[in-house]
């Protein structure tokens, strides 16, 4: 986003070093960037996050909801109520809270100039992730429904809402599920016969965030290699 002239706010919850590294890369390339440590599943933290952006960067025009957690692989009967609630809180409530604050700033109804919201869902929303992460899949299904409903709700207010559904991507998230090499194990099932890269997902997000997708709202990009 910074390469395309956007001022960027990096939100994070724990990894100070990683956030600062990305910030420094953006600043060194001539971009404008701030970092804000906040738990986006906390209403109080989300309000503080957006108020900080208001003061330091101006009203948000693009929101990318990509906060999510993945827990250890298991069957549904092994998932505790506490785990299920935590996954929904981190993966769905965060999306709701951030979208709520974004709409207040983007909507022409509230004096805004419009904007775009891009939610990062998952191919798991369609597959259900049986025997692995039904809780994660269910949370992403909720993100899909939120995407579609909000897109229609705010379409006449200058806001577009879309989502990207990544498939098997080489990220650190698989380690959280207990299988760092999961993509390697499953890539033969992918029609393109390989796992995806985070940079490929970023390109899909960028397209939805910019005016290049100006006639697209309530839509989904399945970036899953054919799955």
Where are these regions (language model features)?
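A conserved structural motif in NAD(P)-dependent oxidoreductases
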Residues: 190-201
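Short C-terminal tail/terminal secondary-structure segment
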Residues: 73, 205-206, 217-227
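Substrate-binding pocket helix/loop in short-chain dehydrogenase/reductase
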Residues: 74-76, 80-85, 186
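Short, small/polar-rich loop/turn modules that mediate ligand/substrate recognition or access, typified
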Residues: 155, 160, 216-218
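The beta1-alpha1 cofactor-binding region of Rossmann-like NAD(H)/NADP(H)-dependent oxidoreductases
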Residues: 16-17, 37-49, 81, 199
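Catalytic loop of short-chain dehydrogenase/reductase
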Residues: 69, 112, 118-142, 147-156, ...
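Alpha-helical segment proximal to the catalytic Tyr-Lys
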Residues: 104, 152-153, 214
């Amino acid at each position: 986003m910074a390469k395309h002239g956007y001022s960027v706010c990096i939100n994070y919850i724990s990894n100070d070093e990683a956030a600062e590294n990305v910030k420094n890369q953006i600043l060194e390339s001539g971009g404008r960037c701030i970092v804000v440590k906040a738990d986006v599943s906390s209403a109080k933290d989300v309000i503080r996050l957006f108020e900080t952006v208001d003061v330091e960067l101006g009203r948000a025009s693009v929101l990318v909801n990509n906060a999510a957690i993945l827990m250890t692989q298991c069957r549904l009967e092994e998932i505790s109520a506490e785990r299920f609630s935590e996954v929904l809180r981190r993966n769905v409530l965060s999306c709701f809270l951030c979208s709520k604050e974004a709409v207040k700033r983007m909507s022409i109804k509230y004096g805004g100039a419009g904007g775009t919201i891009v939610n990062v869902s998952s191919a798991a929303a369609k597959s259900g992730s049986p025997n692995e992460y039904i809780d994660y899949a269910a949370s992403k299904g909720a993100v899909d429904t939120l995407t579609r409903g909000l897109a229609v709700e705010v379409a006449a207010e200058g806001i577009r809402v879309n989502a990207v559904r990544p498939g098997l991507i080489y990220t650190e998230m698989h380690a959280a599920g207990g299988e760092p090499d999961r993509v390697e194990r499953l890539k033969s099932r992918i029609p393109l016969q390989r796992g995806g890269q985070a940079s490929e997902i970023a390109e899909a997000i960028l397209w939805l965030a910019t005016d290049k997708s100006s006639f697209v709202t309530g839509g989904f990009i399945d970036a899953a290699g054919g799955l």
